[in-house]
Amino acid sequence: MLENADLLISTPYKLTRAQLLYDLYAAFEDAARGKHKMSYVKKFEEHLAENLNVLCDELLGRTYKALPSKCFIVSYPKKREVFAAMFRDRIVHHLYFRYTYQIFERTFIADTYSCIVGRGTLYGVERLRHHIRQASLNWQEECYAMSLDIRGYFMHIDRERLLKIATESLKKMSRHKVGVADEVPLPSGVLLTEQTTWAEVRDFDFLLWLTEQIVMLDPMENCIIVGDPSDWNGLDPAKCMRFVKKGLALPIGNLTSQIYSNVYLNVFDQYVKRDLVCRHYGRYVDDSAMIDPDKDWLLAQVPKVRNFLWDELGLELHQGKIHIQEVHKGVEFLGTFVKPYREYVSNRTLERMQKKLQQVDLRNREAALRSVNSYLGIMSHTASYNLRLSMFGEGEFAELIEYDADMKKGWLAA
């Protein structure tokens, strides 16, 4: 168990069995949302009270161990290896998320876009546009955007370093005040005041222990391979957990991995903002952008960024994905091509859409409508009226959209 002697608090909160069980029921609902028809959820629900009570006792007794994960390959939007936790472990992940999400979020910069409520790709594109407008004096002055990418990010996260970063962050935040204006789930019987600290509403001894259990888990240990071995043909060895150094990699597919991807690179975000003093910067997972009027200044940051990532986090900057573009010619970021006063769907995103649309089964109207609706939703935030008409205004998809008049009225309107 991790030491927590430096948690300087006068009234630390201690998690009770009743509270943990209550929170596990809430975490179950989070994990099962939209999946109640899945066989593994139904099986767990058959003995829900018993299963959650057993899980509660394991967590309180510090005997909890994750079950082997399922490993398989997905091809969209690109080929990658996924490790999916068993359903009971996903409940634990959602419990951890409920306990720590708002704590970790307070440590992030405003321009971290992924896996944060109220942010995402659209928010990231809006912030990129905001930074460009500021740096270019509303598109009037010369300005450059430099995009950066990390090679095989999830496969090269050092779990020992991550554990150190996460635990130090939790310990530091335990002393911070929660804030009465924030909607924070509180334990039963706890009242929030202006002076309440996080350590008075969260059991940090429990959180530090659970952090270690989740971070240090080796996904390869006794994992269950799903699919044919040939599914792995053509997968870059740098993106396959069998070929990475022991102690590296987080399982793509787990909720906690999404949280930790931000926790790990928050160190880099702080370096860019505070040490490099880059005012105009944003990051979505491992894709980041730096904007500045001075092209030479941006180029001068590349070796500094490369050295910091390697020395502090053991990560390698993808040399082939460093791009500098004059912003008036357009900047591609998060599937969108941003130009002065307008945005377009990027060519790569459009190619993926067209490929997926070829696989849509038009005989299943409801499922097909969901697919079409998702793509139209993406396109609706860009200058794409003619593109939407060409893809969905005629032919088989037009007949499908005629089936839903509201969709036709909303998405095919100029």
Residue positions per predicted region:
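Intrinsically disordered, low-complexity and often Lys/Arg-enriched segments
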Residues: 1-14, 180-197, 407-414
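Non-catalytic, polymerase-adjacent accessory regions of viral genome-replication enzymes
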Residues: 1-53, 413-414
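Active-site-proximal segment of RNA-dependent polymerases
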Residues: 10-11, 97-159
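Short, conserved non-catalytic motifs in the polymerase core
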Residues: 34-42, 67-93, 107-119, 218, ...
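Short Gly/Ser/Thr- and Asp/Glu-enriched loop/turn motifs at secondary-structure junctions
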Residues: 67-69, 282-286, 319-320
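Right-hand nucleic-acid polymerase module
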Residues: 85, 94, 231-247, 270, ...
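Conserved polymerase palm-domain catalytic core
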Residues: 131, 136-285, 289-304
